[in-house]
């Protein structure tokens, strides 16, 4: 017997097995799994009642909240495709995505009304606007808000056997660093099998209480959420990242786990209010979205009292590909353990990873030779929305090409050296900006750092460090340069250091290196050297 694989089954199972268990905590609201499932099915019924047909796109412009989590199941139950939108995008970027995806419905929070009003006349396909919270005085035609919509609808429960598991379930748009963002099509099968892998890799259970610190419209936000529902764990929603609020929720809800980007983890370990809260329930912090460092792993484990390791993946891979937990047969001690747990990690179950040269031939498993990470798994996307050429380029040879440059060791551990576009090519030598950033992070005065290439007449480009110091800390350019030279080959070290009050970041806390580079390249990065073929 073949039952279609769809994440709808995750919530159905949790409702059957854990109906009275707390499923979602959002501000002062709490929902059991029976209530969670009822609301998701009412959303499905409301969408069908509104004329939404199978395969049509339903967009959500929302911060982390219980309603967005309900959409991950209710929209799919209706047979539609969920389109979560990044709230940090500019109005013209949101308009592009809504038009490119052909969204029929847009759910949005009141705080985004003014912004959406600036582009709604340019939307070619959106027919229905629904407010997620109470209705303000507005010139918009908003006959109902979300709660009124649910109250007026009968629950709809789909016939699972009628689903095509290879049909698109969710459409996520990439950041579009060099062109318009691309829509990543994830199928019901992708999401279901990825969820099972996450359950195993992160040892999730019904006792897991997960704090959703990362927005659910991001890859490293939604991946765990789907899996946690299947296990009957508890979702705790965080609207905006604030260290004190994170600590308060950990104490109040007895949170056991959360995922962070490195800048979030850095903010937590440096928060002066940390000691005011009981963090004894916290067992695991997974760092993803950007490279970690041994220093950060050490500080998280020492100051927050929990295990800390890295996860790696992309929107196109659902997302998880690797995890840096110590695997059977590998034994690390002391600093070696911190370094290992800061690595990109080894392939999780169901994932195949290779590191290849420019001809897609495997590089030696020596932990030194640099190549590109390619992967295949049940979680790899169906393709890019209406972009067959981009899909073919990314999926050539039956493997997804990540664009991330890495080494691979004898025991299968992958270490990302850099994004291909962030590799610094100086005098024909490849220099990893991540290596430099990890080295700078070990300096006691450095809060965070970004290393970028800047033009140089002799070498083509050279590394430049942009550094934010810890509060009340002091360091000079010469001191930091000498610190790097004492730990790295001189040709790899920054040629200069600039101190900044802060670094530009995305909504999830990733450092925007593209913005930092603009000052030096004037937006003309195409003149930068290509990634060197010499390894």
Model feature map: region roles:
Residues 32-34, 169-193:
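Conserved AMP-binding A3 loop
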Residues 350-374, 410-411, 473-477, 512:
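Conserved beta-loop-beta connector loops within the AMP-binding
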Residues 19, 131, 136, 151-173, ...:
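Conserved pre-ATP/AMP-binding loop-to-beta segment of ANL
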Residues 3, 8, 20-65, 69-73, ...:
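Conserved AMP-binding/adenylate-forming core of the ANL superfamily
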Residues 230, 252-260, 269-339, 352, ...:
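Gly/Ser/Thr-rich phosphate-binding loop
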Residues 89, 106-108, 258, 377, ...:
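AMP-binding/adenylate-forming catalytic core of the ANL superfamily
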Residues 10, 29, 45, 49-50, ...:
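Structural core segment of the AMP-binding/adenylate-forming
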Residues 192-209, 217-257, 271-272:
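Conserved AMP-binding/adenylation subdomain of ANL enzymes
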């Amino acid at each position: 017997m073949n039952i279609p694989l769809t994440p709808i089954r995750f919530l159905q199972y949790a409702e059957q097995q854990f109906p009275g268990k707390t499923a979602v905590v959002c501000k002062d609201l709490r929902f059991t799994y029976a209530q969670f499932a009822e609301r998701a099915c009412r959303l499905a019924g409301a969408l069908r009642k509104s004329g939404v047909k199978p395969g049509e796109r339903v967009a959500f412009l929302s911060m982390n909240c219980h309603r967005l989590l309900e959409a991950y199941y209710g929209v799919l139950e209706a047979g539609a495709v969920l389109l979560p939108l990044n709230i940090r995008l500019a109005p013209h970027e949101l308009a592009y995505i809504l038009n490119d995806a052909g969204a029929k419905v847009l759910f949005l929070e009141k705080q985004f009304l003014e912004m959406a009003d600036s582009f709604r006349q340019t939307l070619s396909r959106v027919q229905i606007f629904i407010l997620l919270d109470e209705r303000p005085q507005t010139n918009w035609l908003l006959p109902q808000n979300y709660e009124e919509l649910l109250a007026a609808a009968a629950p709809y429960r789909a016939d699972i056997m009628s689903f095509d598991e290879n049909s698109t379930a969710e459409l996520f748009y990439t950041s579009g660093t060099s062109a318009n963002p691309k829509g990543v099509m994830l199928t019901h099968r992708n999401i279901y099998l990825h969820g099972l892998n996450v359950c195993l890799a992160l040892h999730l259970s019904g006792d897991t209480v997960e704090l959703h610190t990362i927005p659910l419209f991001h890859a490293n936000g939604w991946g765990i959420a789907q899996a946690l529902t299947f296990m009957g764990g508890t979702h705790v929603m965080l609207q905006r990242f604030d260290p004190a609020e994170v600590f308060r929720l950990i104490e109040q809800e007895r949170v056991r786990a959360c995922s962070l980007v490195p800048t979030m983890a850095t903010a937590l370990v440096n928060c002066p209010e940390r000691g005011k809260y009981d963090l004894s329930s916290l067992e695991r912090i997974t760092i993803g979205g950007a490279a970690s460092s041994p220093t950060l792993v050490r500080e998280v484990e020492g100051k927050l009292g929990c295990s800390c390791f890295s996860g790696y993946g992309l929107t196109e891979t659902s997302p998880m590909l690797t995890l840096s937990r110590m695997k059977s047969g590998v034994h690390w001690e002391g600093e070696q353990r911190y370094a290992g747990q800061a690595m990109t990690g080894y392939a999780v179950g169901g994932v195949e990873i290779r590191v290849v040269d420019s001809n897609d031939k495997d590089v030696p498993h020596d932990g030194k030779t640099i190549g590109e990470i390619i992967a295949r798994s049940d979680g790899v996307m169906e393709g890019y929305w209406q972009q067959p050429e981009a899909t073919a380029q990314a999926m050539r040879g039956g493997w997804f090409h990540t664009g991330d440059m890495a080494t691979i060791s004898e025991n299968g551990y992958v270490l990302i050296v850099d994004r291909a576009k962030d590799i610094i090519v100086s005098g024909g030598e490849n220099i990893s900006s991540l290596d430099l950033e990890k080295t700078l992070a070990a300096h006691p005065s450095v809060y965070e750092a970004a290393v970028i290439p800047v033009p140089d007449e002799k070498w083509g480009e050279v590394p430049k460090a942009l550094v934010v110091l810890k509060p009340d800390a002091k360091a000079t350019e010469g001191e930091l340069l000498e610190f790097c030279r004492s730990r790295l080959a001189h040709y790899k070290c920054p040629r200069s250091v600039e101190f900044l009050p802060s670094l530009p970041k995305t909504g999830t806390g990733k450092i925007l290196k593209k913005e930092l580079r603009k000052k030096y390249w004037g937006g003309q990065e195409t003149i930068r050297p290509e990634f060197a073929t010499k390894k």
